[in-house]
Amino acid sequence: MDDMYRDYILDHYKNPRNFGELEGATHTYHDSNPLCGDEMTMQLKIGDGHVDDVHFVGKGCAISQASASILTEEVKGKTLDEVKAIDRDHVLANLGIPISPARIKCALLGLKALKGAAWGLTAWPGEEVKAK
């Protein structure tokens, strides 16, 4: 792994951006990865169809937490449609490192929670509502 990208991920893991409860959140979604124990709640404050603010809370590995931190920085000011259009390839490219198949769910947990919040879901189709 390139040192620059490793440092980038470790920085976002150790100093996550937009971490903590978001007062006045209008859209919230909680998700988890039962295979590794990662958990995450993504909270959005939407105004006039745009993301005015975004925070996340949770616990997990460096990849899941860094990925969520990077996403929160990226989506502020975007429209809900722009947020809904973000895909896995975009998230994986933003991490800048190869992600093993065993860690894909870790890397994409933040995206899944972000999109769940953006869509106003309580659970993805075919999944049970996850308790916080």
Question: Can you name each region flagged by the protein language model?
Answer:
Residues 36, 58-66:
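Short, thiol/selenol-centered motifs that function as redox-active sites or metal-ligating centers
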Residues 67-78:
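Alpha-helical support elements that line or immediately flank enzyme active sites
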Residues 33, 38-48:
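Short beta-strand elements
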Residues 50-58:
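Immediate flanking context of iron-sulfur cluster ligation sites
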Residues 1-24, 28-29, 52-53, 78-132:
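C-terminal binding/interaction regions
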